Amino acid sequence: QITVFEKTPVTNNAAAAPILAKWDKIFAHFEDFSGPISLYSNVDPDAKLRKAAEDCEIKINQFHTDIFQNPKLYNLIKNTQATDPIDQKYRQDILSQFEDTGVQLEPAKRARMKAILDELTKLEQEYARNVRDNPEKLEFTPEEMTGLPQSYISALKKNAKGNYLLGFEYPEYRPFMELADNDDARKRYQIAFTRRGTEQNLKLLKQAIDLRYELAQLFGKASYADWVLKDRMAKTPDAVNQFLAEVQKTVAPLER
């Protein structure tokens, strides 16, 4: 469909509506295909299927980048003229996505942009795996299990000391947090749950931060925040920092 769309004859200032309608239809099909794959990669109980879905995600993201780094497609949309306000907004959003993917960059920078996006996708997947597939178990004494139904307790494994071992799967975590009587045990479980994967993921975050900084440099921006905020309401990091300072000034006295 993209190949056919790329060959669409368009003159300067051509009506945007029919072109945008074709584009929207293509990406509706694209999302129908890619959406379930993303779901499988995150929630399917079969580890092999999750891995296969992750491999597909990488290829899908590479294909997506190829589309939005294609100058022919970019110029096709750019040569249209929209009169309807909704079409104007949609057209500009599409053009911005092309530009944010580096369609206007010189070839070497465009290739580096694609490599960065690929690496960020892989880091994101590894980060999610470290949270989702975390094998760590917490140890709870029989006394700390007070309040939980016997059917729940009977399904748990014990260690040599006779204490119960609980992981981070929701069928284990949620009942404990909702029903266990021991406040300290619930607090310990909650802290461990929110910190799962932290040791490995801090390293991944550092890599992602470095890649995002390099990405911003490709576009001549001082930081990733400068780059990502340019199309958002705040526009600049200074505006965000000023807003946060005002919020802190307002709420800080209320915490005392």
Predicted regions mapped to residue ranges:
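Zn2+-dependent metallopeptidase catalytic domains
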Residues: Q1-R256
